[in-house]
Amino acid sequence: MSAHISASLFGAALALTATAAGSQDMARPKPIVIANDNGGRLQTYYERYEAYVAAGATFRIDGRCRSACTLVLLWADRVCVTERAALGFHQLRDKSGQRAQSESDHLMSLYPAPVREYISAHGGLPPPWGTMWVSGRALRGLVKPCE
């Protein structure tokens, strides 16, 4: 079979698939479940979440999500939390382990307003070696609850 015919058949198959998919009630893809995640490198988490979002993913926080894991809130419109959710926040640190205040302030400015306000009302971000935990019950007033 020539490449031209193969390409034509492939194109026709895609068109038929798209038409069939459009006429059916397609189920929503399952959300990515976040639980028992202690975080890691900010850049790694940011790139991972950005790729998931580009693919149309949504997120369900159903357990602990600490440190860099909380970057998922930058896409709060795609996030829901259960009563089992707990988010752990802290200030960022530089390569020497010292507080990175300006970077922490910048990250705080990116979180949704209700989350920023809650953290500020409860003493602000703790130092990098501490953690402020926000429970599922409190989170459900700050981030969309899961259905």
Regions found by a protein language model. Name each.
Residues 25-26, 147:
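Compositionally biased, proline/threonine/alanine/serine-rich low-complexity intrinsically disordered stretches
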